Curated annotation (Swiss-Prot):
Listed name of the protein: Elongation factor 2
Residues in tr-type G domain copies: 18-262
Keyword Protein biosynthesis: yes
Keyword Transferase belongs to the record: no
InterPro entries in alphabetical order: EFG_II (IPR041095), EFG_III/V (IPR035647), EFG_V-like (IPR000640), EFTu-like_2 (IPR004161), G_TR_CS (IPR031157), P-loop_NTPase (IPR027417), Ribosomal_Su5_D2-typ_SF (IPR020568), Ribsml_uS5_D2-typ_fold_subgr (IPR014721)
GO MF, one example: translation elongation factor activity
């Protein structure tokens, strides 16, 4: 099918929302996700049939092609016919490596269905479980593709009966996850049932695949598959691919089981839109109204060397056209759309308009970042905080400092880092004001390594880096007394105490149930019912910062307090960015303002006076409340032959890790463990060495946990020394005179 014709067809079909499907392909790293996408692409006539699988057309960054893993979510629109009717399938390829799971979260928001790819030999790995859980939370309907079935024959030498048993076991495992994480109203209808055709078995590399109904129609049995591979005749595998082509099996399943945007928005909008569901804007989204006010949710920002910043996202209401004025809800900025287009692989094709339910690319929204929402400018006052924030499963926990090898490249490097952090909102770029270092924080070592390679390839920058540093958090374990914080001019006094937040509160804030901009009574009710708070105290929460600390105003009748409250809250946020122990962010602390004396003259109560007063009282409180450091822990999920179990558990224990569970199936042990990120630098090579290269494993961020007391002081000193701070522990007297 010639390519130019496809663009026209795709654009005309996009106008009929019942003919549109938005899907993603999600899987663990290396389970064959991008190869699957390529095979689908080839069938749409967008890359040639011959090179699919080798082309890795969606892995369009050369970093991805060298490493053979997908780093960016790429978008593409495919064309597929079923029973003579044409459909547009918007396909978003998402990364499977844990360091990039922030991108998966952003992609899921714009999907209605997902193809979950599982390697028939490795089965369900950590990442598969995480991403399936995320997709069920976002009400994205899964269909299953069990890939690499050829490995069961070539490597494990299974018979056709044994293969079928293995596949049934995998389906049961997936259904158990849907039972665990699915919402009650969806889980039964979303479960995988082979006889319906919502699971496909095949090999993306060899381009064959079938569902049970398709195999019945075409007269293909598992024994035919076994014969094709055991005969050693390549032609038999090719014959299989022409009889049951994988793209047909998968795309037929997508059209049949993934809902169109009009159907899916009816149940997805109530989940992701937290505003009034009877408002005009919510109704337009629920009904996928092409004539409604424009609402576009942005899941990706890319820097195009020629066009500038390109925002990619899904149109949830209205029709996107150039010249529209939109309001960016998070950035609180008005922007004008200059151009709209659709994706064909890495190439954007211009379009006059992109209607509701589709994935669009737009120029002109330079202030947007992924997770942003653009709405019709007329509705700017009615959408504040109405979209549920995206929840990332991990947070940046590893930092390196970067400097250009050639000092002349400094401004070029600053510009490149800025662009990288726009494209990847899980990459944090900071400047250490005192040392002038440029710090880059990411989700893990691979995440940073790939970012450095992008600096080199896209911007021609050669940089020097420090070894990776783990990011810590400061916290407390007791309640403090009330401390008086004085302003430098002694005219303002604040009376503040601190105490630790309980785990329920931290979880409620981390998962977005409790948000700063919620109604106070609603927040207090949730905290009382789910986190053991006193209702009246919870009503007095006035701020929640990004590291999960809360500020409570427990004062009554203090003169001039309202006029300075904004300044106090800024002071609180600043103090919590760098705690007193090691200048690391503070996490999980409740700060209570009991009383205050405020000077009547505004000239005597500006930020220069109030910031130190807030900070000093909070820091004195922290230092007297059994302060500690929290370190990030990683979950490990390792599969190894039984004979290596002892060696592998020894590696985990040596790295201050602990084994949580070991499950044995046949000769394979599956080890679940937790290990501090700080100890995981050489983990890959040690696991390989201890298992003769036969360990499969996955990692993901688990939680923050207190550093053992035995190494606490030593660690604080090391961090202070690295940051050029005095090598002694701070004392209360340093903050309270």
């Amino acid at each position: 099918m010639p390519r130019y014709k496809t663009v026209e067809q795709v654009l005309s079909l996009m106008k009929d929302v019942t003919r549109v499907r938005n899907i993603g392909i999600i899987a663990h790293v290396d389970h064959g996700k991008t190869t699957t996408s390529d095979t689908l692409l080839a069938a749409s006539g967008i890359i040639s049939q011959k090179v699919a699988g080798e082309a890795l057309a969606l892995d369009y960054l050369s970093v991805e092609q060298q490493r053979g893993i997908t780093v960016k979510a790429a978008n593409i629109s495919l064309y597929h016919e079923i029973d003579g009717k044409g459909y547009v399938i918007n396909l978003i390829d998402t990364p499977g490596h844990v360091d990039f799971s922030g991108r998966v979260t952003r992609s899921l928001r714009v999907l209605d269905g997902s193809i979950v790819v599982i390697d028939a030999v490795e089965g369900i790995m950590t990442q598969t479980e995480t991403v399936l859980r995320q997709s069920l939370e976002e009400r994205v309907r899964p269909i299953l593709f069990i890939n690499k079935v050829d490995r069961l024959i070539k490597e494990l030498k299974l018979s056709s009966q044994e293969i079928q048993k293995r596949l049934i076991d995998l389906i049961i495992e997936v259904n158990n996850l849907i039972e665990t994480y699915g919402e009650p109203e969806f889980k039964d209808q979303w479960k995988i049932k082979p006889e319906l055709g919502n699971v496909v078995f095949g090999s993306a590399k060899d381009k064959w695949g079938f569902s049970v109904p398709m195999a019945g129609k075409r007269g293909v049995k598992f024994s035919d598959v076994v014969n094709a591979y055991t005969s050693g005749d390549k032609a038999k595998i090719e014959e299989l691919a022409s009889k049951v082509p994988i793209h047909e099996a998968l795309l037929d399943a997508v059209i049949k089981f993934v809902p169109n945007p009009r159907d899916s928005q009816k149940y997805r909008i109530p989940k992701i839109w937290k505003g009034d569901l009877d408002s005009e804007i919510a109704k337009a989204m629920i009904n996928a109204d092409p004539n409604g006010p424009i609402v576009m949710m942005i899941n990706d920002m890319k820097v195009d060397p020629h066009a500038g910043l390109v925002a990619t996202g899904r149109v949830f209401s209205g029709t996107l056209r150039a010249g529209e004025e939109v309001w960016l809800v998070n950035a609180k900025r008005q922007q004008r759309i200059l151009q709209v287009s659709l994706y064909m692989g890495a190439i954007r094709e211009l379009a006059e308009e992109i209607p509701v339910g589709n994935i669009a690319a737009a120029l002109g929204m330079d202030a947007a970042r992924s997770g942003e929402t653009g709405v019709d400018i007329r509705f700017k006052d009615s959408v504040l905080g109405s979209f549920e924030k995206l929840h990332y499963i991990s947070e940046p926990v590893v930092t390196i400092s970067v400097e250009p090898r050639n000092p002349k490249d400094l401004t070029k490097m600053i510009d490149a880092l800025r662009k990288l952090s726009i494209e990847d909102s899980n990459l944090v770029v900071k400047i250490n004001e005192e040392t002038g270092e440029y710090l880059l924080s990411g989700m893990g070592f691979l995440h940073l390594e790939v970012s450095l390679q992008l600096l080199k390839e896209n911007y021609g920058l050669d940089v020097v880096t420090t070894p990776p540093i783990v990011v810590y958090r400061e916290s407390i374990r007791n309640k403090s007394q009330v401390f008086e914080g004085k302003s430098p001019n002694k005219h303002n006094k604040l009376y503040i105490s601190v105490e630790p937040l309980n785990n329920q509160t931290i979880d409620l804030i981390a998962n977005g149930t409790i948000k700063e901009d919620m109604d106070n009574k609603e927040m207090a009710k949730i905290l009382r019912d789910q986190a053991e708070w006193d209702y009246d105290e919870a009503k007095k929460i006035v701020a929640i910062d990004e590291n999960i600390n809360v500020f409570i105003d427990a004062t009554s009748g203090v003169q001039h307090l309202r006029e300075i409250m904004d300044t106090l809250l800024q002071g609180f946020r600043l103090a919590m960015k760098e705690g007193p122990l090691a200048f690391e962010p503070v996490r999980g602390v409740k700060v209570v303002l009991h009383d205050a004396v405020v000077h009547e003259d505004p000239a005597h109560r500006g930020p220069a006076q109030l910031y130190p007063a807030v900070r000093n009282a909070i820091f004195a409180g922290i230092l007297t409340s059994k302060p500690t450091l929290l370190e990030p822990l990683q979950k490990l999920d390792i599969r190894i032959p039984m004979e290596y179990l002892g060696n592998v558990t020894a590696v985990i224990t040596r790295k201050r890790g602990k084994v949580i569970n070991v499950v044995q199936t046949g000769n394979v042990a599956r080890v679940y463990a937790e290990i501090p990120v700080g100890e995981s630098f050489e983990l890959a090579s040690e696991l390989r060495a201890s298992s003769a290269g036969r360990a499969f494993w996955g990692t993901e961020f688990s939680r923050w946990a207190p550093v053992p007391d035995s190494i606490l002081v030593d660690l604080i000193m090391k961090i202070r020394e690295r940051k050029g701070k005095p090598k002694q522990l701070p004392k209360v007297e340093d903050f309270i005179s």
